A protein has these predicted regions:
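Short, solvent-exposed segments of well-ordered alpha helices
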Residues: 24-34, 49, 99
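Compact alpha-helical subdomains of small soluble proteins
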Residues: 25, 54-125
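Bacterial N-terminal signal peptides
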Residues: 6-15
């Protein structure tokens, strides 16, 4: 499941990069990207406390999304803020891995995968 999320993120990055560069304002998929950024931040924190030994994998996925999307100014700041909001929100709630944290991880992976699939279906050539 994690591999398919990574693959979907890469496809999204490639598909969205060109249209996003052509637009100065908000892209039609910005809300989805904001949510995806928040999910990546959440997973970066929760997977870390639950002993996944993934290191900066989720942060690297976020950076890859930013690099491919090349948002400027406010869009970039909103994406980064979304990632940080996801990370900080769960940092305040969970200090150790709990069964609830494991459930949250599964749910966020599922939601991120769905967003990735939907974006790919809508905006891929």
């Amino acid at each position: 499941m994690l591999r398919s999320l990574f693959a979907a993120l890469l496809v999204i990055s490639a598909c969205l990069a060109a249209p996003a560069r052509a637009q100065e304002g908000a892209a039609p998929f910005d809300a989805d990207l904001q949510r995806l950024a928040e999910i990546l931040g959440t997973l970066h924190y929760l997977r870390g406390i639950c002993g996944s030994n993934e290191g900066p994998k989720w942060r690297n996925q976020m950076q890859a999304l930013i690099d491919a999307e090349t948002p400027s100014g406010d869009r970039r700041a909103r994406m980064i803020a979304g990632f940080n909001r996801g990370y900080n929100g769960f940092q305040q709630t969970y200090r150790t891995c709990t069964p609830a944290a494991m459930v949250a991880i599964r749910r966020y992976i599922d939601e991120g995968s769905k967003i990735s699939r939907d974006l790919t279906a809508r905006y891929a050539n």
